[in-house]
A protein has these predicted regions:
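Solvent-exposed edge beta-strands and adjacent loop segments
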Residues: 1-69, 105-134
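Charged, amphipathic alpha-helical segments
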Residues: 60-86
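Short, acidic/charged, Gly/Pro-enriched secondary-structure junctions
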Residues: 78-108
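Hydrophobic lipid-interacting interfaces of membrane-associated proteins
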Residues: 138-140
Length: 141
């Protein structure tokens, strides 16, 4: 499920110490969930050529596209704005997980952070601008 462009899927965002957020009101003009290729893998090979295992390197970056009027978008904006700072660095970032379910298949992204929310092009009225929410995850279960 690298890219979802259907509204038949169910997305749930789990934030540390908070109730789950059921995602609604996707941006109809873009993919609702996409996984970017920030993940690489290397194989461990011994000097005699024996292959042992794959190791995953890097983070998984996922983008969630919501319409501007989405209640989920407002909750994510609140979450992003309330990350605590000490000087220029973040001191508290709540851990997030995202569960994606489509046709009985479930993918779970755990141990991530909400990185940013990027507003889309202005349509003349800011409340209807779509927003792309970017998450970073170390792994997918």
């Amino acid at each position: 499920m690298a890219v979802l462009s259907t509204n038949n899927a169910t997305l749930t965002i789990l934030v540390a110490n908070a109730l789950p957020i059921k995602v609604e009101n996707f941006d109809p003009n873009s993919d609702m969930w996409s996984v970017d290729d920030l993940q690489t893998a290397d194989g461990e090979v011994t000097p005699d050529g024996q292959f042992n295992h794959w190791a995953i390197n890097g983070a998984i970056q996922c983008t969630l596209n919501l319409s501007g009027g989405s209640k989920t978008s407002k909750k994510l904006e609140f979450l992003l704005n309330n990350q605590q700072r000490v000087g220029q660095s973040l001191s508290y970032i709540p851990e997030v997980s995202v569960v994606v379910t489509l046709n009985g298949e479930t993918e779970t992204y755990v141990g991530g952070i909400l990185k940013q929310g990027k507003a889309g092009r202005s349509l003349g009225y800011p409340k209807i601008n779509p927003t792309a929410w970017v998450f970073l995850f170390p792994r997918k279960v």
